[in-house]
């Protein structure tokens, strides 16, 4: 791609929806369309734009062993094309029939003014290697999957793939995959088992060369795509490498509706705070809200409704506030058509979302007088105002007094309440709650 710069595709943290938190491995075309339609109608005007299909979209049997506690069916015969590349399962994505792949669905999502994303596991299908199935090469040389597969590079939690060797024909395989994704109209690719290859604790960044091959494949395919790496925790010593080749990288393992995980995120954000910027966004994972987990239940039971998000309203507000001021990617985890009014209000507060688009880095400035209170600050480019978010991480009510900068502070604005507070500088915070303020100098 002429004059390609991977930062251009994500000048701000990407905002969208991901199917995983609600649908697990089971999402189908009708459900993706319903979520896209909801986003276009209710969220697009606030900046939400990516519709991302998560793991196992090529497996026609995904979810059928949920009752047995099996998330990923061992050695499943998922769908591939003549070059060992995954293609959508037609029983779940009927518009893909006839070799069309995800193009009809991507075209529909684009027609709504949105962007389309998919999840892939790094590597090449194991059964393609076992059966010596062909791959597409740049020079027509007959190469089979086993010749580029690394059987010593596998996922700890998913049985589908072998890693790809760092070699010319390994690059050809990734080039051919992303050539296909470009033909489909893919705008966002989440690559899994690559940010931290946790099968190998002594070498958690063992897929470093595959990250480079995938980044090269995006550059070679002729279409801009956001590159998102999972799972975490990302390896801080490799921050420079993530920033050179990816747009997003997960700084945590899967994040769920558990206060302990949310509280721990403050420390992770502090570690990564100096590595945010144009095209480079440390990723706190999805925003779980409202209803979750339907795809983990019995798919044949009408009683399966998933579960209600366990976060309190205060905790949900704290989550969205931290992600926003830290400038993490914002990916909603739920079934959008079921969003309740409160959850929708979190996702459509333009004053909160503006923090996420602020071009300057935020930083954590913990209170020197109260270890239970964490403060995040982000200066505004006009040098006339700044954001200050105050978080009560304790289980007790806390009274917090602002340590205001020198100047006139007659305009302290509460971003969640959407009202000016005058020169008020003392706040009472309920457990696990926060205040998001914009302070004019």
What does each of the following model-derived ranges do?
Residues 1-33, 38:
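N-terminal module-boundary/linker segments of secreted carbohydrate-active enzymes
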Residues 14-19, 49-54, 115-120, 187-192, ...:
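Structural recognition of the beta-strand scaffold that forms the well-ordered cores
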Residues 317, 323-326, 331-333, 369-407:
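Carbohydrate-binding surface patches
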């Amino acid at each position: 791609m002429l004059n390609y710069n991977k930062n251009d595709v994500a000048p701000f943290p990407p905002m969208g929806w991901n199917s995983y938190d609600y649908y697990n491995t089971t999402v189908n075309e009708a459900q993706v369309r319903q979520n896209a339609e909801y986003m276009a109608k209710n969220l697009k005007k606030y900046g939400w734009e990516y519709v991302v299909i998560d793991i196992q979209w090529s497996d026609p049997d995904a979810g059928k062993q949920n009752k047995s506690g099996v998330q990923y069916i061992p050695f499943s015969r998922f769908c591939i094309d003549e070059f060992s590349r995954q293609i959508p399962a037609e029983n779940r994505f009927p518009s893909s029939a006839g070799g069309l792949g995800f193009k009809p669905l991507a075209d529909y999502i684009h027609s709504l003014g949105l962007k389309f994303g998919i999840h892939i596991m790094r590597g090449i299908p194991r059964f393609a290697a076992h059966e010596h199935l062909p791959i597409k090469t740049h020079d027509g040389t007959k190469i089979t999957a086993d010749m580029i597969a690394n059987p010593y590079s596998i996922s700890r939690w998913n049985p589908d793939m072998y890693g790809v060797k760092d070699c010319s024909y390994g690059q050809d395989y990734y080039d051919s995959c992303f050539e296909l994704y470009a033909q489909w109209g893919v705008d966002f690719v989440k690559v899994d088992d690559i940010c931290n290859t946790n099968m190998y604790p002594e070498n958690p960044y063992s897929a470093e060369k595959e990250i480079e091959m995938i980044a090269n494949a995006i550059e070679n395919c002729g279409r801009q795509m956001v590159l998102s790496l999972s799972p975490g925790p990302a390896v801080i010593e490799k921050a420079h490498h993530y920033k050179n080749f990816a747009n997003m990288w997960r700084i945590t393992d899967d994040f769920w509706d558990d206060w302990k995980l949310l509280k721990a995120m403050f420390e992770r954000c502090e570690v990564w705070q100096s590595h945010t910027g144009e095209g480079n966004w440390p990723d706190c994972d999805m925003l779980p809200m409202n209803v979750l987990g339907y795809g983990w239940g019995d798919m044949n039971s009408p009683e399966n409704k998933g579960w209600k998000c366990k976060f309190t309203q205060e905790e949900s507000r704290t989550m969205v506030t931290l992600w926003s001021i830290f400038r993490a990617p914002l990916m909603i985890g739920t079934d959008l058509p079921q969003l309740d009014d409160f959850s929708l209000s979190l996702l459509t507060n333009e004053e909160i979302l503006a923090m996420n688009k602020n071009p300057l880095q935020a930083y954590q400035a913990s209170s020197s007088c109260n270890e239970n209170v964490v403060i995040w600050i982000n200066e505004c480019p006009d040098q006339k105002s700044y954001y200050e978010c105050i978080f009560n991480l304790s289980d007790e009510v806390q009274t917090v007094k602002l340590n205001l900068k020198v100047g006139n502070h007659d305009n302290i604005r509460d971003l969640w309440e959407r009202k000016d507070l005058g020169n008020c500088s003392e706040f009472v915070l309920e457990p696990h709650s926060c205040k998001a303020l914009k302070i004019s100098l």
